[in-house]
Amino acid sequence: MVAAKKTKKTHESINNRLALVMKSGKYTLGYKTVLKSLRSSKGKLIIIANNCPPLRKSEIEYYAMLAKVGVHHYNGNNVDLGTACGKYYRVCCLSIVDPGDSDIIKTLPGDQ
C-alpha cells in the first residue's frame, strides 16, 4: 500500500516538473526531433513512454549513450505522456533541451 502511494507521488511530481518544462523551458517532441537533438548534442534528458516500440526505444538509448545523456523511462503510456506535456495527442518520446525553471534534470538523472 505504501509503495503504491509513493510511486503515485513520484509520478505526480514528474508530471508537475514536466508541466513546468513545457511552460518555461525548451523541448522537442517526437522520435525524429529527439534523434536530431541527440545528434547535435542539444538534449539534456530524454523521456520515453513505456509503450514505445522496442526498436525505436533501443535506437534512442543508443544515441543517448553516445551523447552521454540520461534516459528516463516514463511510467505510463504515450497517451499519459502527452497529457503530462499538456498536449492533446500522443507523445512517445521527448527531449528536454533547456529545463527552464524546472529541476527535472537534477531529480531524474536517468535510468542508466
Curated annotation (Swiss-Prot):
Annotated Pfam families: Ribosomal_L7Ae
Keyword Ribosomal protein: yes
Gene Ontology MF terms in the entry: RNA binding; structural constituent of ribosome
Keywords, comma-separated and alphabetical: Ribonucleoprotein, Ribosomal protein
Key word Ribosomal protein present: yes
InterPro entries, sorted: Ribosomal_eL30, Ribosomal_eL30-like, Ribosomal_eL30-like_sf, Ribosomal_eL30_CS, Ribosomal_eL8/eL30/eS12/Gad45
Gene Ontology annotations for the cellular component aspect, listed alphabetically: cytosolic large ribosomal subunit
PROSITE patterns, A to Z: RIBOSOMAL_L30E_1 (PS00709), RIBOSOMAL_L30E_2 (PS00993)
Family affiliation: Belongs to the eukaryotic ribosomal protein eL30 family.
Protein's recorded name: Large ribosomal subunit protein eL30
Species annotation: Lupinus luteus
Taxonomic path: Eukaryota, Viridiplantae, Streptophyta, Embryophyta, Tracheophyta
